Amino acid sequence: MRVRGALQAAALLASALWAAPLLAKDHPTFKTTKLDTQPNNLNYFEGSDTILFHDTHKSNLWRSDDAGATWSVVKDIPDGKVARLYMHDFDSKRAFAITDGRKHYRTTDQGKTWKTFEVDAAWDTERFDILHFHATDPDRIIFNGLHCLGFLCEEVSLYTIDDFETPAKPLRPDTLGCWWAKSSPVFTTGDSDLDKDRILCIIMGVDSIFSEDRRLVISDDFFKADKEGNIQEFEPNLAGDKPVRGVVNVAAVKRYFMVATTSANTDEMALFISTDTKKWQRAMFPNAHDDHDHKIVQEAYTVLESTNYSIQLNVMTGSKSAPMGIMFTSNYDGTYFSENLEYTNLNMFGHVDFEKIAGIQGIFLVNKVDNGKEVDEKPSTKKKLVSEITFDDGRTFDKVTADGKRIHLHSVTELNNVGRVFSSPAPGLVMANGNTGDYLGDYWEDANLYVSDDAGKTWKKALKGPHKYEFGDQGSILVAVRDSKEEDISEISYSLDHGENWVDEKLPDDLKIQPWILTTTPDSTGLQFVLIGKAKGAWHVIHIDFEGLHEATCKESDMEEWHARVDKDGEPTCIMGHTQTYPRRKKDAKCFLKKEFKLAEVETKDCDCTDQDYECDYNFERNDKGICVSRGPIPIPEGACKEGDRNGKFLGTSGYRKIPGNTCKDTKETKDKYKDVERSCGDGIGAPPDEATGELQQVDTKGKFGHWTHWEKHYLERGESSSDSSETIIMRGMNRTVDDSGPKVGPIWRTTDHGKKWDKVDFFKDDEVISIVPHPTVKDWVFFLTEGKKLIYTPDRGKRFRTFEVPQPADFEAAANGIFPLIFHPDKPNWLIWLGKKCESKNDCYRVAYGTKDGERWETLARDVYRCEFTGAEAYGRKYANRALEQILCLKHEKEGDNDSALQLVSSNDWFNQDERVRLKEAKEFATMAEFIVVATEDTEKKTLRAYASLDGSLYSEAKFPFGFEVPHQHAYTVLDSSTHAVNLFVATRMEGDKSLGTILKSNSNGTSYVVSVKNVNCDQYFYVDFEKMVGLEGVALVNVVVNPDAKSSAPKKLQTKITHNDGAQWAYLPTPRKDEFGKFPCSSSGTEKCALHIQGYTQRRDRGKTYSSEGAVGVMFGWGNVGDSLGSIKDADTFMTTDAGITWKRVKKGRWNWALGDQGSIIVLVPIRGQKTDTLEYSLDQGATWKKHTFSKEKVDIWDLTTTRSGNSQNFLIWGENSDGLFTTKIDFTKFTDHVCKYDPENLSKSDYQIFSPKHPLQPDGCLFGHVSQYLRKKPGLKCFNDFRLDPLYSKQNCTCTRSDFECDFNYELDKHGQCSLVSGLKPKDHKLWCKEHPDEIEYYEPTGFRRIPLTTCQGGLDFEKAAAVHPCPGHEDDFERKHRVSGIAIFFAVVLPVAAASAIGWWVYRHWDGKFGQIRLGEQGASTMEFFDADRPWVKYPVIALSAVVALAGAMPLVLGALWRTAKSTAERWGIGGGGGGRGGWSRLDGGGASRTFRTRDSFARGRGDYTIVDEDEGELLGEESDEEV
């Protein structure tokens, strides 16, 4: 076996002991080096006897240049500096020693000498590919590292083209790893220049840290920027003609490049393959059948040792507690996979019992689970493993036998040595530990050593017991050492005749060891071996040399021709279409080859093709007669089948394909037998859709569901990376009656075609399901809670169901109050926390948190908990160093056993195994929203609440509210949607039942410093807030404010609606619509206090699960409301909509109608609300410009709901209602309206079916919002085409230069009457020295200016109001500060001349930009018309502004504006070489001091007011099934 990877380990100090060499010529010689710590990461330089290993305890490197006989510490590297050792993948003379700093070490002479090199980045401890090497130019290396500032980290990629002789250069911002295209010697782009320079990088999504938004970009000039700053790169069309988001991994496999993508709502991944990085195709897997699936799931697929002609892949299908898989082999292009073997054995790390026989084509060994079906149904069942071998690359499999008996072999999942498990480059020689019998037994109790010298066809028992083993001199020597758990091994064994006879040899000095590894050179051509073992607390590196055994070198007469496969007469037969013949020393020859580092050369001869050279093609499978029959659609060749032509013909596969890599010569018979045959276009993959009829279709399901008062329904929405196109819904009927008479719930139904066909799920017939709980982020998974310990779940949207038991029953009383027993991890669907109710006696019960990673094994996390939550996530872990993926927060009672004791917030980053820390005491509640963790604690003396915030779950800072914002006896906070890098925190300022109201505060980027966004915001008695974000657009939201907060208690609230387009910095009234077909409005205006459009808010809606907008329809919003001076009664409301993000509105219907948006906003359907019986719906295909009616029922019915997928991507809708026969559903299908797929041409949008929509701010005509101009794609209204993929709506984003609009008032500052941020009277500015403490790597801080940068802005350059005052050094960084700010003469020239020269220009700038720049970003209640008094066209403003411009510039603006301009000039000077410078994801969460928990992660859950799931459906307003309009 050869050393390939790291060895586990501990530490090392050496004193060498030399055992006296044995005198006899027929004995090997031994030399022993004694160490006091374990050698780690032993690596040979290929083609040499030079070895390195890493002392991880003392952080040193050791080197031997004589195959391990002598060792010494590398002297060129300072003691204790080596953190990791990397060998160059493609140059056998180079290696790299990475340190914990930025100075590292490299060698180009196999470790004789080492040179330093520096990289401006730290190494990422969680990456294995820190260094990525170019396959043909060893000087070209990519360094993937980290830049960290405190606990905030970002990944960076740098490159060198001269082996770090000069400093490495950064590639581009926002990288998550980069790779050379030429990552494998056999891969090529087809262009030598591209092979040399092409780089692929995964980059962050636009304004997103989530994996589903990541992208793949390619550059051929190191991502250099042009003169305008645009990076020279392109996004490849992974999906054939369009890019794909969600790129999470890139891998080079021989001649293939593989890209894995993920998406929201699913854990299924998509694989895209290219053989040149130019043309990409999605990997296609055959249709699933029988009892297993064929989808690729995150962390559940393994790329096996592949070949130059196909990819071999193992896909996990079983539970992670008992993992099994299916092995697939691709065609030559790597795109179409066929199944080889099911129930392959693998372990929880994804290692598969699979290994090819080295050097021989088409042979590999596998272990499979013989009772796989039983294990799949019950994961606790013990696996029964059997070994099989294939000689035709997986087409067929044979048993492994020794002396006529079946044997089973320990493989990759039970590694006991390093390197390959079974074979080496020694031709045909294979060794393995195993046993005879029906199944694989225990390694220690049952295993013996077996040997094969015919590549695994026949085996013989060699030695008793399990052994570590190696091959030398191309198989002339076999060496083995008995494996043991104890330090009791005193000898080795070796064989010189292919394992027929063995000789035992004692270790020197009566040494007894516990063997650890036995290894030799990677090519197994040498006569020297290294054995490492442990004895009496020390480690021994034993060098074994067989040089003296045979002095003779083999002659031609000592050699034989060995054929990889022979017939019964000993004649060579064909494997993979050819014979394979190797020169090999005869078994009994008394000589050594002594051809170090030279492998045996194989001779091949092609054979004529036979049936054995063919296998079933993609989506074909052999039947009982051995004939390949179709199991699914057939690939259509490129260019065949015109669009819309389902009846056309094409030449497609016969159902057979030549085994990839098979080189047999075609014969006339095989050509005729396996030639392509004529197929129908309608039977192919991606077949044209049925011809469009232009008609709306519907499918009714009536009289099937019975009579119930409510529906419980769950859309299990698929992701973009899902391989199927199903639209799955799970539902059941429910009864909510006053006297609880009759059944409470009905049977569970499932549809996969959006309601066309419903099937009853019989799996639950013996179980009473209390609650149906879809996973909040991975919609493939659904959990079904029962009253006892049994929990049922499906990992694939209801195709299969499994069960497991939880440790204790749920506390359903607590669940009714919002504390739910099942808590999910956002990234890992099988990571669960269960809150169980444990009772010592009837009256002594407490809550215990249990954790599991697979549902089978549960560990106690914490006792006496109130609730727990996963706060770790892959996205946050990359950004915040302390926020581990395993991070959990719990509210736990301070005194164990005392449920009345105070709660404290505790955290753990390791499932509470070793790490448990108290973060805050007297905690009342906590909530997570986007990246923020917000905690409410109680001031026990003042009986008020305090808010704390954290980004990493470790450091919590108290929220600082603005001066004067004093609320006595605070009892409730509500964390609103905070997806724009700032917390929107609602603080209740009046808590008087239906008179309650409060203030929305907006935080800085770390959630700790707050300013007022809007006051007197309406809420209800439960502190649910009239706040609604527009989905898919940043910073757009609606609120309802109370305009009579001081009215008498008997007076009803008077509400008005306001909108913000810049994340709460400004609020304006909604403009009134124009006169329409329904009549006049009572008034008309652009939106004023006296006349505006007002929309019913969140607290007034009956069905709080409904949102105003849809993720798929950017800028489109609906609502019920009225025009006037305030919001009227909901009974008098009409239905309004906007298509431009709230700039303009129109009335689409009198009265209240329910809406649903499909096909990414191009289909809109309206139906009357419940209680208004109808037989008609209305729809629009042009964004509401025109409407058409459709009669869907012969009788008037009561429509309870209208639904479609939440993403808005579907062309199907579902009406839920009640008629005379009971409950019914009607599917409304728009797929027949067109068969034309919308065309997207990013290079020429005029030829595209899409147009650009750019949201505007009504007060900012330049189009810059949050420092950039965003452009979104929307389908052109009225076009008859459909979206066949989820369009990434964000088309482009261009940053603007920074202006006043990109800054808001800092803490303790407020807007004065001039629109400037002034210090509140009597207060001091925030001590900005705290910046130095919070950011220990910073060297300077700025005096406060009163302004701070808006967290969401991305502006660059221009004015910097935040850093416009004096700058000072941070304590301890005075020298660094001095070096940075040392000013040259030319810079002084700029400092003096520029302000004077700019003064008059600034005066003009002040005048020209008064409207849009000064006084417009404010955090208050002013509407669109509040600045009219200061309009620049007013005579009392225009001339004074011009007259006073110079004074403003030189006096008032000098400290601020010119300070910002100075920095602009300074950065420009530095660029010239002058000077010496250096869509929201969440919902709402409530923090309630009253003790009731409200854990709201999604808008659905908040809508229900019951946490993440509920026993009842989302229509929470209809508790008793009443239909009164008053119940809102």
Curated annotation (Swiss-Prot):
Protein name: Vacuolar protein sorting/targeting protein 10
Recorded GO CC terms: cytosol; Golgi apparatus; membrane
Gene name for this UniProt entry: vps10
Classification of source organism: Eukaryota, Fungi, Dikarya, Ascomycota, Pezizomycotina
Function: Functions as a sorting receptor in the Golgi compartment required for the intracellular sorting and delivery of soluble vacuolar proteins, like carboxypeptidase Y (CPY) and proteinase A. Executes multiple rounds of sorting by cycling between the late Golgi and a prevacuolar endosome-like compartment.
Subcellular location: Golgi apparatus, trans-Golgi network membrane; Prevacuolar compartment membrane
Topological domains, Lumenal: 25-1385, 1462-1528
Glycosylation sites: 308, 735, 899, 1006, 1244, 1295
Family, similarity comment: Belongs to the VPS10-related sortilin family.
InterPro entries recorded: Sortilin_C (IPR031777), Sortilin_N (IPR031778), VPS10 (IPR006581), VPS10-sortilin (IPR050310), WD40/YVTN_repeat-like_dom_sf (IPR015943)
Listed GO biological process terms: Golgi to endosome transport; Golgi to vacuole transport; protein targeting to vacuole
Keywords: Glycoprotein, Golgi apparatus, Membrane, Protein transport, Receptor, Repeat, Signal, Transmembrane, Transmembrane helix, Transport
